[in-house]
């Protein structure tokens, strides 16, 4: 019983793995478990504390998940996060309601005088980690309106009286916000205090990303069989390619497909990048007409993603048959899986969006799947990429979705629309680079909207399309802020797009954060 663990109860939140990530940062061993786990399953584990995750569900739903009473009676500290706080409150006799005012994104919490150890506010010189107000990240519609007997308020916001609560006797805590998200400015410190000071967790370990272990795992899994990998030009597929190549050498074949939905001169750029990473087998294929034909008449974003994903798989299988390859490698990372996952306790419409590399394999696909990065976040992938010598322009190249421009053209896909968007996007990115802003922004791109707007050009009335610019700043792509690009630069981008791209009459800038908005529009 020397090993100590923090138990993370998963209610289907997209942030559950992010909670686990924070445990890794803190140095705590953890177990992620379904909410249906029973106490008897944990008898041989030294559980020092419990974290209850968020959820897309509501405790007001008839079939809302909850932990069993024997878990609540384990006599260890418990911290409920968002939904986790709601279910804790409801099970202990409090009340939760859906309020007319929702909170998504930043909120300022005021820490009250009757603080707990969770919000340590000793303001001596050596302990100024906390202030009486903190910025936190909210994502909720329901709110606690009555707390159970024995609980006190720790913090409030303008719209949420019970932003944080605690029961001193039982060491039960609840926070309405998400401390696991990097945008909660003191979130790490809150979780760190819960684990080390409240749970008295002492078995601190140092997690490390072992490249050698990843390569060895690939080698042992694949043996002497051939692997094909869809190379997109982004950091995820490039890092996967280098790791797999180190493991199996020339048994790796990278497939680079021009599907007509790529950025401007993308294939040429990929060829130039390949020269910088070494001798890797790359096969270039042009399937523009095939992809555009398959998307004819489709407007629903999920159907677009699945159509593209299925066609990718079919082409990979065709190439695998030619090469006699048994494996398909993908640069899937954990946020892809989170957005595509459907927990079995959830309704079907609670998943966020499908990713082409996380779709179920279509019929007729015989390939085995290899995903060396699937448990890693983007910042972890960047650390590995840097260690294995991948050039900076790949590491910090902005992500590009697998379905490409298809999810940046709202509505039906036409070659004409692709050309318009490609030109607008190239202008936006080139302006960011010329102003030395590109590498300071996590992701930037243009979106072609399915609406037209009136303009006057050369004394003539024009009724043409609208482009939306999107730029965000983020560490792990699980939450994001819109990038505060100077007006002068936005003005230059807008003028150039309207003057240089035929068919565009108006340019707008997207100032939505994640959550609630996803980074991509579709």
UniProtKB/Swiss-Prot annotation:
Signal peptide: none annotated. Residues 205-397 form the GMPS ATP-PPase domain. Pathway: Purine metabolism; GMP biosynthesis; GMP from XMP (L-Gln route): step 1/1. ATP binds at residues 232-238. GO terms for molecular function: ATP binding; GMP synthase activity. Residues 5-204 form the Glutamine amidotransferase type-1 domain. The keyword RNA-binding does not apply. Gene3D superfamilies: 3.30.300.10, 3.40.50.880, HUPs. Homodimer. This is GMP synthase [glutamine-hydrolyzing]. The gene is guaA.
């Amino acid at each position: 019983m020397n090993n100590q663990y923090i138990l993370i109860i998963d209610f289907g939140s997209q942030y559950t793995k992010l909670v686990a990530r924070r445990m890794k940062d803190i140095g705590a061993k953890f177990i992620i478990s379904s909410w249906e786990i029973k106490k008897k399953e944990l008898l041989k584990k030294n559980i020092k504390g419990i974290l209850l995750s968020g959820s897309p569900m509501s405790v007001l739903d008839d079939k809302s998940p909850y932990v069993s009473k024997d878990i609540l009676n384990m006599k260890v500290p418990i911290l409920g996060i968002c939904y986790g706080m709601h279910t804790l409150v409801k099970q202990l006799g409090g009340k939760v309601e859906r309020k007319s005012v929702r909170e998504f994104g930043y909120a300022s919490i005021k820490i009250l005088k009757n603080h707990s150890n969770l919000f340590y506010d000793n303001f001596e010189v050596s302990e100024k980690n906390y202030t009486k107000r903190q910025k936190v990240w909210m994502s909720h519609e329901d709110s606690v309106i009555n707390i159970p007997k024995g609980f006190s308020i720790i913090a409030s916001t303008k719209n949420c009286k019970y932003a944080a609560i605690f029961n001193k006797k039982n060491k039960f805590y609840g926070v309405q916000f998400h401390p696991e998200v990097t945008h909660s400015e003191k979130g790490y410190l809150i979780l760190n205090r819960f684990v080390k000071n409240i749970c008295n967790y002492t078995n601190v370990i140092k997690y490390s990303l072992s490249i050698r272990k990843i390569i060895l795992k690939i080698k042992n899994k694949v043996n002497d069989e051939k692997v094909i990998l869809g190379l997109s030009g982004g950091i995820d597929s490039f890092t996967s390619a280098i790791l797999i190549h180190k493991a199996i050498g020339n048994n790796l074949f990278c497939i680079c497909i021009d599907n007509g939905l790529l950025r401007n001169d993308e294939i040429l750029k990929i060829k130039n990048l390949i020269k910088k990473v070494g001798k890797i087998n790359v096969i270039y294929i042009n399937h523009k007409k095939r992809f555009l034909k398959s998307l004819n008449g489709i407007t629903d974003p999920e159907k677009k993603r699945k159509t593209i994903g299925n066609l990718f798989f079919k082409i990979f299988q065709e190439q695998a048959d030619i090469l006699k390859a048994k494996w398909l490698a993908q640069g899937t990372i954990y946020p892809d899986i989170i957005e595509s996952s459907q927990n079995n306790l959830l309704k079907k419409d609670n998943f966020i969006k499908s990713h082409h590399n996380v779709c179920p394999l279509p019929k007729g696909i015989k390939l085995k799947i290899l995903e060396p990065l699937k448990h890693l976040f983007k910042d972890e992938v960047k650390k590995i990429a840097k260690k294995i010598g991948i050039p900076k322009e790949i590491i910090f190249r902005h992500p590009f979705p697998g379905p490409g421009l298809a999810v940046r053209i709202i509505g039906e896909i036409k070659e004409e629309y692709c050309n318009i968007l490609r030109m607008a996007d190239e202008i936006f990115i080139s302006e960011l680079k010329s102003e030395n802003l590109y590498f300071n922004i996590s992701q930037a791109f243009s979106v072609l909207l399915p609406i037209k707007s009136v303009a006057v050009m050369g004394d003539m009335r024009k009724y043409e399309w609208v482009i939306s610019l999107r730029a965000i700043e983020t560490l792990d792509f699980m939450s994001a802020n819109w990038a505060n690009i100077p007006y002068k630069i936005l003005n230059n981008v807008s003028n150039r797009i309207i003057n240089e791209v035929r068919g565009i009459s108006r340019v707008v800038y997207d100032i939505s954060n994640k959550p609630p908005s996803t980074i991509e529009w579709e």
